[in-house]
Amino acid sequence: RRAGCVAVSDDGHPVADSLLMRRALEYASMFNMPVINHCEDPSLKGDGSAHEGYNASVLGLRGIPGAAESIMVERDVSLGELTGGHVHVAHMSSRGSLRAVQSGKDRGVSVTCEVTPHHLVLTDESLSYDTNLKMNPPLREVADRDAMIQGLVDGSIDVIATDHAPHHADEKAVEFDSAPFGIVGIETAVPLVLDRLLHTGTLSLSRIIELLAVNPARVLGLEAGGLQVGKPADIT
């Protein structure tokens, strides 16, 4: 903590071992740090490359069920309840995951979560073999997208985060199954959020600032995310 560490993360690789996750939460809680997990059951994800459902079947793509994410979220929320540690769910995409987070918050578990702009504006109906839309977690169904938006409205979701994962055009210019997961996010996040959430009247500007700046700083325990005398001039 003194050296500047603000959180513990698996860096995009799910912590499949429940005991390891328990220990991480126990030790991180000693330093008031959250554990950020890429929630995904590797055995359920398998070699999938798109959300498991009608559109993946039509395109002949191997699917990743929403349960691959929500099962891990349910586990981590339970471990957070057991240990008293702070769980932060990264780039949530499944309505089942949202239900697990809401249930945990209702029980007083220290759990926060985030959603990406692309999971708020796109669905698996957009795929059509476009490798630029291959990401992990994958684009989900309309019902999942709508649940994420509602989670922002009712306060269940704490943060909008980019999950910025760019790749060179040559890396994406291959078959869908062979392309790397990842999509750009930094340069599109604010315009998308303003266009789809502010200008439609879905969220207020103050709520958007909270989701993009204030709450991320709070989750990480940083003196940032606002403009106040004597505080760091850092709102991102």
Task: For the regions a language model picked out, list residue spans one by one.
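His/Asp/Glu-enriched, well-ordered alpha-helical/loop segment
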Residues: 58-86, 132, 153-154, 158-160, ...
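Histidine/acidic residue-rich metal-binding segments in metalloenzymes
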Residues: 1-160
